[in-house]
């Protein structure tokens, strides 16, 4: 935590001195975009970084005759819904819009489309990731 505090103390001095109070006006040419965003977020919340990650790691595994994604591990926003994830997978696999895609958590149940990935991660995540199986036909439950 002391390292985080040191980083937070160093970051505000550069953006405020160079660009005044308007952090959004910084361009990639004058300053890197990452320090202003972390400086704007970090001082208000001082919780452990492991519990409050904005993105979580999910592991996507194909089931049955569904095409396999070459990239299996993805970082996804906690607020993304299962339906948003289904739409992303369909687009990534270039599936026809009329084709169905089912998502299963731990090979046991299909979460509702409006369920947030962050909530599933908190309940069913293990080893720092959430394992989701996807398929074009119903497999479990």
Curated annotation (Swiss-Prot):
Coiled coil regions in record: none
Checking CDD domains in the record gives: Ubl_ATG12
InterPro entries hit by this protein: Atg12, Ubiquitin-like_domsf
Region of interest: Disordered: 1-53
> Could you tell me the keywords of this UniProt record?
Acetylation, Autophagy, Cytoplasm, Isopeptide bond, Membrane, Ubl conjugation pathway
**In what ranges is there compositional bias, type Low complexity?**
23-40
Task: Specify the superkingdom.
Answer: Eukaryota
Q: What is this protein called?
A: Ubiquitin-like protein ATG12
Kindly list the organism's lineage: Eukaryota, Metazoa, Chordata, Craniata, Vertebrata
Q: Which gene encodes it?
A: Atg12
């Amino acid at each position: 935590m002391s390292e985080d505090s040191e980083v937070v103390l160093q970051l505000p001095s550069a953006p405020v001195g160079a660009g005044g109070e308007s952090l959004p006006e910084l361009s990639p040419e004058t300053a890197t975009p990452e320090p202003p965003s972390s400086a704007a977020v970090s001082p208000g919340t001082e919780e452990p970084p492991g519990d409050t990650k904005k993105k979580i790691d999910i592991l996507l595994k194909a089931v049955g005759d569904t095409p396999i994604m070459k990239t299996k591990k993805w970082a996804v926003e906690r607020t993304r819904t299962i339906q948003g994830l289904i739409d992303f997978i369909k687009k990534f696999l270039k599936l026809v819009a009329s084709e169905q895609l089912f998502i299963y958590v731990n090979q046991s149940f299909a979460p509702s489309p409006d369920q947030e990935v962050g909530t599933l991660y908190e309940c069913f995540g293990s080893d720092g990731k959430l394992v989701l199986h996807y398929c074009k036909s119903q497999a479990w439950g």
